[in-house]
């Protein structure tokens, strides 16, 4: 059958944005084999997410296209995670435009829809220019999406307060967000006069979302119903919660993974799993506090830690803890979290990690760094009650001991596990045949099937 439609998929190639977008595209492509999906991202991103270990199979109607990452010749990464993002965003509109023209030339089929990471707000202008629908995908939680929609109002309401007063205020004027304080907000949201490309990107996104045909969200209806319904009714956004996108069914279990083998030897709910994502690790003093506490208490642990970060661990720590702990440079996180030996997940509270902890019924110790992570951590502790945050946002030996004992050994920790268990069942129900996320996916698929009809 000749393809009748051509969807341009524009990815944001940093953090864990591109992988869930590809998961969604792969599912759409399987359900709509007569649609071409041209997937645009940077070459390094494509190499990573199109690896055969990440998905069971990639649809034959999905074709990846590499776009320039925007970094100047001879660029050397300074360590600031915002730096490569801003280079990419500066060049992104022209780069994506050129790449889409190449895809049209290759396929002989004009673009009939733009499916993009929600960060790429300029896709709204592209879609208007060529007269096709724009469907942004928000890969984080509904709570953080809502905050970006209300950026101007939040800035206006807090303008009269000084810094100390702001810190005590909550976002009680937006339904479902009364637990969020000003100090939890993403830095880019509150930087009113910032000329940061990333801050401007997020602001523009919030202003452009009303132009979307639908907004697909990597979440499920039952976790934030008040927020989702508010976005639909008050902001007139066609929110389609279609998550969790990354489930065990969408990843291949490693056949011979050393950390999974090690977990099989551990007692149920006894192991601390530590991973802070792919972008940043705690500073050296916090790494030392974590390590010292784990060693002194002899708490079994599995730590996903890149080789270059191990220099911040106490000398000979790995050797001294080898009988009850394990450090690996990479871990298959979903399969680790589903193992019954895991008792708690020490995490930065990125949304993918938070969703995975819910889907695998593991309570959380949150140490957020930037972006939506502080918002997620607040929801984890005070709204969903499935974990605890680190006081002051800093691991000390005393604080590490407190949070580990709270989650692993106290009645409060048992309540957290019960709460996350209830959320897990709701997440599982959402992706069942008649679940809310499945119905929303079918609504999204129907929008694609209407293309060129």
Swiss-Prot record:
It catalyses: an anthocyanidin + UDP-alpha-D-glucose + H(+) = an anthocyanidin 3-O-beta-D-glucoside + UDP; delphinidin + UDP-alpha-D-glucose = delphinidin 3-O-beta-D-glucoside + UDP; pelargonidin + UDP-alpha-D-glucose = pelargonidin 3-O-beta-D-glucoside + UDP; cyanidin + UDP-alpha-D-glucose = cyanidin 3-O-beta-D-glucoside + UDP + H(+). UDP-alpha-D-glucose binds at residues 139, 331, 333, 348, 351-353, 356, 372-373. CDD domains: GT1_Gtf-like. An anthocyanidin binds at residues 17, 148, 371. It comes from the Eukaryota. Signal peptide: none annotated. The active site is at 17 (proton acceptor), 117 (charge relay). It is an enzyme of class 2 (transferase). Pathway: Pigment biosynthesis; anthocyanin biosynthesis. PROSITE patterns: UDPGT. SUPFAM superfamilies: UDP-Glycosyltransferase/glycogen phosphorylase (SSF53756). Pfam families: UDPGT (PF00201). GO terms for biological process: anthocyanin-containing compound biosynthetic process. InterPro entries: UDP_glucos_trans, UDP_glycos_trans_CS. GO terms for molecular function: anthocyanidin 3-O-glucosyltransferase activity; quercetin 3-O-glucosyltransferase activity; quercetin 7-O-glucosyltransferase activity. Its EC number is 2.4.1.115. Keywords: Glycosyltransferase, Transferase. Belongs to the UDP-glycosyltransferase family. In the presence of other necessary color factors, this glycosylation reaction allows the accumulation of anthocyanin pigments. Anthocyanidins are the preferred substrates, while flavonols are only a minor substrate in vitro. This is Anthocyanidin 3-O-glucosyltransferase.
